[in-house]
Amino acid sequence: LAAFENDGLVRDPDTSIAGTEVVEVTVPSGELVTLSTGFKVTAALAVESPGADLPELVTESPTFVFEDDSSEDYYQVVVYDAVGDIVWDASNIPGGSGGGPVEVPYAGEPLEAGMYYQFRATSIRDKNGTITPISRTEDLRGLFVYSP
């Protein structure tokens, strides 16, 4: 699986490109399954903070910082708690088209002290109303624990 190491790559989320569809496979107990379907990867949006490499202690309301994509129209940033519930979802964050890192201050409900969180950013292209995700941050980055 492409998601289980920090290698600067993510499964390409652009569904307008052949071979990028999410593949789901049900494996009956004790049976072998052969897969003929592949998938494509693309460069991930690099997380700068918090949680660029390891979970990071955050003592104030966080600002999420990640590398700017060069071809996005806007971003979406979603914050999850330790059990995977969405605690904040910000869409239509303006892109800079490759002009330095993107900084997004957290503007959701108060975070719970001692809770682990993760932010994920997705770059979005909007071509004549057709919305297409083109890259995102890696699944194992952007982790932080809130401790005011």
For each feature predicted by the language model, list its residue ranges.
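Beta-strand-rich modules
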Residues: 1-3, 111-129
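Short, compositionally biased P/S/T/A/G/V-rich stretches that sit at domain boundaries
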Residues: 26-62, 147-148
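Structured interaction patches on ligand/partner-binding surfaces of diverse proteins
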Residues: 4-36
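Extracellular fibronectin type III
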Residues: 16, 126-147
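Conserved aromatic anchor
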Residues: 60-72
